[in-house]
Amino acid sequence: MPYPSSVSFQWKSPLAIALTSSIQLNVKSTCNTDCMNFLKSNFNHTISFPLQQQTGLQDFKVSLFKEIDLPRITPSVSSVITDVVVELSSSNPMPKLQIGFDESYILEVTTNSISIKAVTVYGARHAFETLLQLIRISSNKFVISQLPIKISDAPRFKWRGLMVDPSRNPLSPLMFKRIIDTLASVKANVLHIHLSDAQTFVFESKKYPLLHQKGMYDESFVLTQSFLRELAQYGANRGVIVYGEIDTPAHTASWNLGYPGVVANCWDYIVSTSMRYGENVLSLNPANPNTFPIIDALMKELSDTFGTDYVHVGGDEVWTSGWSKSKEYSDIQKFMKSKGLNSLTELEGYFNKYAQEQVIHNGKHPVVWEEVFKKGNADKNTIIQVWDDIRLLQQVVNSGYKAIFSAGFYLDKQMPLCNSYDSSTCVNTHSMWVWTNRDMYDNDPVKSLSSSEKENVLGGEGCSWGESTDEQNFFDRVFQRYSAIAERLWSKESVVDKESHEVRANYLRCLDVRRDIMKGTGPLYHSFCQLPKKEKSN
């Protein structure tokens, strides 16, 4: 899981090998210190530690009924394998972590060896994850049966991500590392952190510290720059790119708590209309002298902190009434006149373009939500994230932009395929919460695109908006269903068997709970997953 590009094996063959939790890594190619440390760390994380955790446990089962369970094979063990041989073919096997690096691998298991061939360490890391899923427990032994096995694998999309939103309900630093570990286990490679919104501002700004000091419930949940640098490195050690988002010009009410006046004050209008979640209407005040210097500083700090190639500047859901109904509207009109802006829509575009320019000036690629493209405000260097109107995806790529898609992958919704422009899509979804993973699995918005159009689609992101998730339910709400998104982004377009996916995802969930990285995630359906006993504490 996700299902590989090519798999060959002997169906129900008892021919098997055994291995122990002390199995060793054997790197046969040139690999410098950083390369070797990466491989050793990930081999221990993905193979050695999980096997140690599973010692003495029973094998995973789908059912008590043999007819519908996984193949029950009594393995005939021909040998005990003591090492996993890894060969890397690139002269630079550990390139800079960026979208488009080679993640392919070949994994072969025979009666006398386990071998992995990859171009880079990132491909080898994926192979470790696949190898772990081949290992089963039989008579207190770790075995791989149905030999020989050969798996050739590579991702369908370059960008396979998850957006998390700690600005609605906070998440602790440790949670982010568990999220990265879980993403790596399903071969995802991007973590997008939504660092600010109307409700709170969780990013530490050294230039404008009152943003987080006044704009956060508790400073213990502020994501400091030192932690985010550490997190970006932690992600790199798992092959996961970490990048941040500061949303502008809307969703910025929290900025005003630290720097009064930088957000246009339309609270009277919001209260008078009894608007639900009205704080989301407020937008930045262009007439305030602090507004644009703060944007400058934040884009620079984001660029420097994460060190990756991407900075998300938001741009979604701008309500022009947030300006027209504000107490500062006359000053805003004067600003518009000084800049030659004839409408509030043009003012929105001014903000969009300004934020992108700052990111480009810092040598990074801007990422924006679809509205920035839809209103003609996207720079050609900008990546467009299509989140609502999936019809825009084709328009985006035909206009020469790179795109990622999130429409149909909203993990805060029970009806993930419900399109705002077509109410008929909001009815034929599964009523059971757990089976909404099938709706996400069916979501493949590039199927109708031509080959040339698909070249501009980098991939996609699942989105976990945080209004109703915190540390108590995050993993269950998100990762119980993210496996469907992960397989859609990795596996071939022809891989469409939802029941097969559920069995494989359920087993991977069991493995991940056993190795302490997917704790709190419920099963996809009935199954048996024995967990290691924990020592009781007083």
Curated annotation (Swiss-Prot):
Q: Name one GO cellular component term.
A: membrane
Give the protein family: Belongs to the glycosyl hydrolase 20 family.
Q: Taking the first listed entry, what is the main subcellular location of this protein, grouped into a coarse class?
A: cytoplasm
| The EC number(s) this enzyme carries | 3.2.1.52
- The answer to whether keyword Oxidoreductase applies is no
Q: Which reaction does it catalyse?
A: Hydrolysis of terminal non-reducing N-acetyl-D-hexosamine residues in N-acetyl-beta-D-hexosaminides
Q: Which residues are glycosylated?
A: 44
Biological process (GO) annotations held by this record are: carbohydrate metabolic process; glycosaminoglycan metabolic process; N-glycan processing
Q: One Pfam family this chain carries?
A: Glycohydro_20b2
Q: What is this protein called?
A: Beta-hexosaminidase subunit alpha
Q: Which residues form the active site?
A: 317
Q: How is it modified after translation?
A: Glycosylated.
| InterPro entries found in the cross-reference section | Beta_hexosaminidase_sua/sub, Glyco_hydro_20_cat, Glycoside_hydrolase_SF, Hex-like_dom2, HEX_eukaryotic_N
Where does this one sit in the cell? Cytoplasmic granule; Secreted
Q: What class of enzyme is it?
A: hydrolase
| Key word Secreted present | yes
What keyword terms does UniProt attach to this protein? Glycoprotein, Glycosidase, Hydrolase, Secreted
Protein role: Hydrolyzes the non-reducing end N-acetyl-D-hexosamine and/or sulfated N-acetyl-D-hexosamine of glycoconjugates. May contribute to amoebic pathogenicity and may be involved in the destruction of extracellular matrix components.
Q: Which GO terms describe its molecular function?
A: beta-N-acetylhexosaminidase activity
Write down the species: Entamoeba histolytica (strain ATCC 30459 / HM-1:IMSS / ABRM)
Oligomeric state and interaction partners are given as: Heterodimer of one alpha subunit and one beta subunit.
